[in-house]
Regions:
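Protein kinase-like catalytic core scaffold
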Residues: 51, 84, 101, 175, ...
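Active-site ExK catalytic segment of metal-dependent nucleases
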Residues: 52-59, 104-106, 195-197
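Catalytic activation segment of kinase domains across protein kinase-like and atypical kinase folds
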Residues: 169-201
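ATP-binding glycine-rich phosphate-binding loop
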Residues: 2-49
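Conserved structural core of kinase catalytic domains
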Residues: 80-160
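Short amphipathic alpha-helical segments that mediate assembly, nucleic-acid/protein binding
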Residues: 3-7, 21-24, 148-152, 160-164
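Conserved hydrophobic "DFG−1" position in protein kinase catalytic cores
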Residues: 45-46, 55, 102-105, 186
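ATP-binding glycine-rich loop module of kinase domains
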Residues: 31, 37-82, 86
């Protein structure tokens, strides 16, 4: 199925912006698609796609978290820190007014590196953890949630101090406070964040 065919299929089937879980689940089941649901969004995937469709939920939250996340991505691009965020784009707007977004398909992985590199990495990670800027940003940035020390130190090591300072300011300014291990991972060897809308209650 091409992206246009997917869009046309959604446009012909989803006629209400306030789409409910059961209706979307039935739509996905009848078209051989998989659906996953979080607190603020639905995700639709197909084994043939290299992207994931994201549809905002309005049944239990009032904010459009996809629009917030997309705006965050565009702002990250302007600041030059987009490489730490999983790429996303606007897929289209359905006739009912519902905006659909897409994100690169992502398989969660821990970085698989050999033992010698792992030992070297651990030494570097320990060194980074002792840095004042690391301790300060890691302790204060995330509103009670925790990214693993390994992920944060790895990001610090790969992207550098200036980049991570910019990143920390950005997450604070945009209220991206729910950065925890379910929202971060690795794409290849690169630390990335796949959910960066924040949670606003």
């Amino acid at each position: 199925m091409t992206q246009q065919e997917v869009f046309d299929l959604l446009n012909g089937s989803l006629i209400d912006k306030q789409i409910g879980y059961d209706d979307l689940w039935e739509f996905c089941r009848s078209h051989g698609l998989e659906m996953f649901s979080g607190e603020t969004r639905y995700c639709i995937i197909s084994k043939d796609w290299d992207f994931v469709l994201k549809i905002s939920r309005f049944d239990n939250v009032r904010d459009d978290y996809n629009a917030i996340e997309f705006a965050n991505y565009e702002n990250a691009c302007k600041l030059g820190i987009e490489k730490i965020f999983l790429k996303m784009w606007k897929f289209g707007t359905l006739d009912c007014g519902l905006d659909i977004y897409a994100q690169v398909r992502y398989s969660f992985s821990h970085s698989n590196i050999d033992n010698k590199k792992e030992r070297k990495m651990r030494k570097q990670t320990d060194k980074i953890r002792s840095c004042k800027i690391y301790r300060k940003s890691h302790e204060n940035a995330y509103d009670g949630y925790r990214i693993s020390n390994e992920w944060y130190a790895r990001a610090y090591q790969i992207y550098g101090k200036q980049f991570m300072r910019k990143f920390e300011r950005f997450t604070r300014d945009k209220r991206i406070g729910d950065l925890h291990d379910s929202n971060v991972g690795y794409l290849g060897k690169m630390p990335i964040i796949l959910d960066f809308a924040g949670y606003h209650g």
